[in-house]
From Swiss-Prot:
A lipid is attached at residue 22 (S-diacylglycerol cysteine). The keyword Iron does not apply. It comes from the Bacteria. A lipid is attached at residue 22 (N-palmitoyl cysteine). It is a lipid-anchor. This is SPbeta prophage-derived uncharacterized lipoprotein YonS. It is found in: Cell membrane. It comes from Bacillus subtilis (strain 168). Residues 27-46 have a biased composition (Low complexity). Disulfide bonds: none annotated. GO terms for cellular component: plasma membrane. Residues 1-21 form the signal peptide. Residues 27-57 are annotated as: Disordered.
């Protein structure tokens, strides 16, 4: 997630500046510094980082440029079919990156079950939340690059990421609604129905 990585770098630079400014004070109180360092180390060690990815609310896991804390989650897979496309929402995570940036990560998988060339664009999925916020497109910078065109029996998977302005937007999140346009062929003929999925989350 590029934006999260930039945020992590910014936090690192800020920390280095603060350390440089406090250098003289730290040298004159080495015993106090040792105590503080020990405290910081213990605090860091006491924060469990989920190495296998998040599984429940409250989990902290690694992302590019730092960590994210889960505010709401769905581990239940939802699979639907529209025309020749089989579409699965594998996981939904609402989290806050580096205690600053709220986002929703929708992990998906799409499969063309036909030999036709099919155009299907989950990368343009519209999202609405139970908290009353609507985002018309995922963040192109943060989301994985997904196929728009499926040449025969191929599949694709990845994350589509929605970035929010305020943590309140995902606090106590009960569900999301995901809308995706119908698949179509090279002649622009619709091959199925639009998808309109509701995913319930634990929070």
């Amino acid at each position: 997630m590029k934006l999260f990585k930039k945020l992590g770098i910014l936090l690192l630079i800020t920390s280095l500046i603060l350390l440089a400014a406090c250098k003289n004070s730290e040298e004159s109180s080495s015993s106090s510094e040792d105590t503080n360092n020990a405290t910081d180390t213990n605090t860091s060690e006491s924060q469990d980082i989920s190495v296998n990815g998040p599984e429940k609310v409250g989990d902290v896991y690694e992302i590019d440029g730092g960590t994210a804390k889960v505010m709401a989650i769905s581990n239940k897979e939802t699979t639907v079919k529209t025309g020749p496309i089989q579409f699965t929402v594998k996981k939904v995570i609402a989290a806050v990156a580096n205690e600053q940036l709220p986002f929703i990560d929708v992990q998906i998988e799409s499969e063309n079950t036909s030999d036709e060339v099919v155009r299907f664009r989950p990368s343009l999925a519209q999202l609405a939340t139970s908290t009353g916020v609507q985002i018309d497109e995922p963040s192109l910078l943060e989301s994985d690059r997904l196929l728009d065109e499926y040449v025969g029996k191929v599949n694709d998977s990845g994350s589509i990421i929605y970035v929010f302005d305020n943590e309140e937007d995902i606090k106590d999140l009960e569900s999301i609604r995901l809308r995706i346009s119908s698949p179509f062929n090279e002649d622009l003929k619709n091959l199925g129905d639009k998808l309109d999925l509701k995913i319930n989350l634990e929070h």
